[in-house]
Regions:
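Acidic, low-complexity intrinsically disordered regions
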Residues: 1-269
Length: 269
């Protein structure tokens, strides 16, 4: 499956240039249950990073960095290197190895520590994406993460932490971490692309100066929580094929319906 390179597409719609520096951290759940969401996750992150690249392109004098943390079980938390946004490569499905359990609190704590150490005095946004509840953290608890977030708010008011979950426990977990309604959304399992889209919009409003920090607004919440339906394409009226005996069948009559389906393009890493 070919991943759309959202960081390379020439978008005819101009976006407002950034008016501040920004460090972005993605905390992405890659537990076993995320396997079927790899395409949506890769495309969603590419869309957000691509939008940031546009906002920070020359002649913009401000800078942005991106760090991606992938987590599953407590011993499978992979912390990527923070790099300038223009150096961030396109994410592919194969970059997301989904397996294991969900060490949510351990991963969030690591992200907060990284944000505090690398973004002192610099605006920062941390996105936490998960489809489940914590079931494998060993070092941190929800209570300790709550304390870390509260301390971060006092020391770094320019930092934003947003929780995006599709599990029924999402709202409860967000509240348990001390995150209010403007910093958390609970979306349906079929709404993953929309969830990343509202995150892109929220970050865009912040870096362009429309809002002081990255946060969701009412429209974002409604959009993410409204059930998503694939656009329906009307089918052409069915025309019965003429009856032939085997001796009358032509090669075209043996064409498979799958011939009308675009071929799958495989990309190598």
């Amino acid at each position: 499956m070919q991943i759309q390179d959202s960081t390379q597409i020439q978008d005819p719609i101009e976006v407002a240039a950034a008016v501040k520096d920004m460090n972005v951290i993605f905390v992405q759940d890659v537990s076993g249950s995320m396997m079927d969401e790899r395409r949506s996750v890769a495309n969603g992150i590419n869309e957000i990073v691509g939008d940031v690249k546009k906002r920070y392109k020359a002649p913009c004098e401000h800078k942005a960095t991106v760090c991606i943390i992938q987590f599953s079980s407590h011993d499978c938390i992979r912390v990527g290197t923070a790099m300038p946004v223009h150096d961030v490569p396109v994410m592919r499905e194969t970059d997301l190895v989904c397996d294991g359990m969900t060490a949510l609190w351990d991963a969030v704590a690591i992200a907060i520590e990284r944000m505090n150490s690398n973004s002192a005095g610099v605006p920062a946004t941390t996105y936490i994406f998960t489809d489940g509840d914590n079931n494998d953290s060993r070092k941190y608890t929800q209570s300790s993460v709550n304390e870390m977030i509260a301390d971060n708010k006092k020391r770094n008011p320019m930092h934003s932490i947003l929780f995006i979950g599709s599990d029924p426990s999402a709202k409860r977990n967000a509240e348990g971490m001390g995150l209010d309604r403007m910093h958390s959304i609970q979306h349906g399992s079929d709404n993953t692309p929309v969830a990343y889209e509202v995150c892109r919009r929220a970050l865009g409003r912040c870096v362009s100066g429309d809002t002081q920090s990255t946060e969701f607004n009412h429209d974002d919440i409604v959009m993410s929580e409204t059930p998503y339906h694939e656009p329906h394409t009307p089918c052409a009226p069915h025309t019965p094929l003429p009856h032939h005996t085997d001796s009358q069948m032509s090669d075209d009559d043996y064409a498979f319906a799958s011939d009308d389906v675009p071929s799958i393009v495989h990309r190598t890493s």
